Amino acid sequence: MATPLFHGSIVALVTPMTHGEVNYEELKRLVEHHVQAGTHGIVSVGTTGESTTLSIDENVKVIKKTVEFADGRIPIIAGTGSNATSEAIILTKLLTNSGVAGCLSVVPYYNKPTQEGMYLHYKAIAESTDLPQILYNVPSRTGSDLKPETIGRLAEITNIVGVKEATGDLTRLPLIKKLAGEDFIFLSGDDATGLESMKLGGQGVISVTNNVAAADMAKMCELALAGKFDEAEAINQRLMALHHDLFIEANPIPVKWAAYKLGLISEPNLRLPLTTLSEAAQPTVLAALQKAGLI
């Protein structure tokens, strides 16, 4: 089977900010960093990119700037999710002809739709665009779980091409493959189980860890895709503390602080209601960076 466009180590990119405003010069440097490190794709303004605290205009500008900075060297996936179907459609349409390779759309959060509601939500979005759509299931944040059976139904829609599955439940992967078909792209949204999902046939990881360990994550995923799981596991074990401790507080709080400590961004700050990593948690994240050999 040919390698799909969306595969390997895909970074859920942080959005750098200075004094509360998006810093586009730093964003340009981050994109270049990932191109040079071998990252296989970038998710722009997903959860890690603080999509919920950016305005629609800011979302679109950050995504378009990311595409501009990438200059065709790496596929850009746009975070376009909303818990209002109409808003998700608006954001998706605003990216027509923008150069994005596809869209990542989170399960509607807070309002807890039924499985039929989720199906109709994604169907309406897909029918509004020609852009490839990736479903994003993260029940710990949304309060709703997109079931494998619903994913199977959605896979019948031509431009719904894959899923980011962030439950960490590896039993779902073979079931989703069975229901959605072997060509349906399965991307782990859980760094701690990402390599295990690739051993079971997943095509890659949409990764938070990649923000601070881009070259390692790219190499690990390349080894996994080549079936060299022992070598991939050696890298994975070195990064395992990061996989866990970058979630010691709500993402992207720890990873922004970690990126700041590594000099990748100039400020660790986020927009309210998110706050900078607490002093109590900082030694844990610092130790994880040390275990990974990054400092």
Swiss-Prot record:
One of its GO terms (molecular function) is 4-hydroxy-tetrahydrodipicolinate synthase activity. Pathway: Amino-acid biosynthesis; L-lysine biosynthesis via DAP pathway; (S)-tetrahydrodipicolinate from L-aspartate: step 3/4. It catalyses: L-aspartate 4-semialdehyde + pyruvate = (2S,4S)-4-hydroxy-2,3,4,5-tetrahydrodipicolinate + H2O + H(+). It is an enzyme of class 4 (lyase). It comes from the Bacteria. Pyruvate binds at residues 48, 206. It is found in: Cytoplasm. Its EC number is 4.3.3.7. GO terms for biological process: diaminopimelate biosynthetic process; lysine biosynthetic process via diaminopimelate. Keywords: Amino-acid biosynthesis, Cytoplasm, Diaminopimelate biosynthesis, Lyase, Lysine biosynthesis, Schiff base. The active site is at residues 136, 164. CDD domains: DHDPS. GO terms for cellular component: cytosol. Belongs to the DapA family. It comes from Actinobacillus pleuropneumoniae serotype 3 (strain JL03). This is 4-hydroxy-tetrahydrodipicolinate synthase. SUPFAM superfamilies: Aldolase. The record marks 47, 110 as: Part of a proton relay during catalysis. Homotetramer; dimer of dimers. Catalyzes the condensation of (S)-aspartate-beta-semialdehyde [(S)-ASA] and pyruvate to 4-hydroxy-tetrahydrodipicolinate (HTPA). InterPro entries: Aldolase_TIM (IPR013785), DapA (IPR005263), DapA-like (IPR002220), Schiff_base-form_aldolases_AS (IPR020625), Schiff_base-form_aldolases_CS (IPR020624). It holds the Pfam family DHDPS.
